Structures are given as C-alpha cells and as structure tokens.
C-alpha cells in the first residue's frame, strides 16, 4: 500500500523517508512492477530515502514471522522517536501483527497505546478522520466483553473535553457539534435493551 501510494505521487517522493529494510522494499517494488528507486544516503528527484533497519528473516507475504517481531518494534520506535525529536515532521503507520509482538514478549495492544506511552501522554483519544467525518473512540483494543464496563461517565466526560478542545484548537472548528453514539440497539430503549445509556451516556 505504501509503495503504491508513493508511486502515484512521484513529485512528492523527496518529502518521505521509508523506515525498514531496503532490500525488502526493492523486492516489493519489483514484484509490483513499480518504478521506484531507493537510497540509504541521498534523496534525488525520483528516489525514496530509506532509514535502514534490517529484517531478521525474509518476509513471506501473509505469513508473519516471530523472528521479525523485533524488526517491527524497531521500525515503530525509530519513527516515533524521530517524530518526537523533530527529525521527522510526522509519521504514517500501516497495520502490524500484534500477536507476534506479544508472543515475542512485548506487551502491545496497538499504535495508540504505544505512542501514548512513548510520548508520556496520560490522556489520549483515537480519532479517525476524513474531510466529511470525524469519529473518536471511547475505548480502544479491548475484547468486546470488556467494553461496556469501560464506558463510564467519568471516562466519557474526560474524552469529550479532550475532543472538544482538539476540534477547536487543531481543526479550527469554532463550535463543535459532537454526537455520542449509543452502545446498545436503539440506545437501550430507556433501559429495556441495556442500561449503559441511562447510567452513563445520557447523563453526560
């Protein structure tokens, strides 16, 4: 996905740095029949600069390897620290296999929690956004059976305040209008299909 996106924006290649194994990128590039060039040192007109982090084992697409769990973490760590240290202006992440990271021995539930921890950020809200719609999540990376217990009045109030402030400051929305979705079918039907709305959502 990353290489295909870059191939469609050739004029912007110099704005990006890929973090990972350069030979892996070259292999993908050849397999996809794209026309990208990669370099470890310089950025030229049609070249993508790569910050080299070597794979432990050659990648087999669709078959995540425990041997490459550390590689995945190292890539994420370099991108995160580089952004915090302002060596990079921003970071773009793709999906990663959480199971092999946890099997490797590193407790990992998702990018959101990882970034909050590494940046020492206590309160964090995940926001999915495009030009038409912005969706904030009240919980992240939890088994479904644990979700309802996490949605409390205190948690919602905290998240809504963060969201309201961010919409004003970063998105320049003067008076944000925030809709809170119900947890149960038909928002609980006044308690007949669940009580989370009457106990938490409506109160907030």
Give names to the regions the model predicted.
Residues 49-50, 124-126, 135:
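Conserved beta-strand scaffold positions in the cores of enzyme catalytic domains, especially
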Residues 128-159:
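Ligand-binding beta-strand-loop-alpha-helix segment within the catalytic cores
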Residues 1-111, 154-201:
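Contiguous, glycine/small-aliphatic-enriched amphipathic segments in soluble metabolic enzymes
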Residues 112-117:
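A glycine-rich helix N-cap at a beta->alpha junction
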Residues 127-128, 172:
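Short beta-strand
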Residues 119-122:
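Phosphate-binding loop that captures ATP/GTP phosphates
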């Amino acid at each position: 996905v990353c290489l295909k996106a870059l191939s469609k924006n050739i004029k912007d290649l110099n704005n990006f740095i890929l973090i990972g194994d350069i030979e892996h990128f070259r292999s993908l590039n050849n397999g996809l029949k794209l026309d990208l060039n990669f370099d470890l040192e310089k950025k030229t007109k049609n070249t993508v600069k790569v910050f080299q982090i070597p794979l432990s084992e050659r990648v087999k697409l669709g078959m995540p390897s425990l041997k490459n769990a550390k590689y995945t973490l190292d890539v994420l760590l370099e991108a995160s620290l580089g952004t915090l240290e302002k060596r990079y202006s921003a970071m773009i992440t793709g999906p990663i296999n959480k199971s092999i990271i946890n099997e490797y021995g590193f407790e990992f539930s998702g990018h959101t929690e990882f970034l909050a921890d590494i940046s020492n950020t206590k309160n964090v809200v995940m926001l999915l956004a495009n030009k038409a719609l912005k969706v904030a999540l009240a919980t992240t990376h939890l088994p479904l059976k644990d979700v309802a217990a996490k949605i409390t009045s205190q948690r919602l109030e905290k998240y809504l305040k963060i969201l309201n402030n961010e919409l004003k400051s970063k998105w320049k929305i003067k008076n944000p209008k925030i809709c809170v979705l119900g947890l149960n079918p038909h928002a609980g039907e006044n308690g007949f299909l669940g009580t989370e709305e009457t106990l938490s959502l409506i109160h907030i």
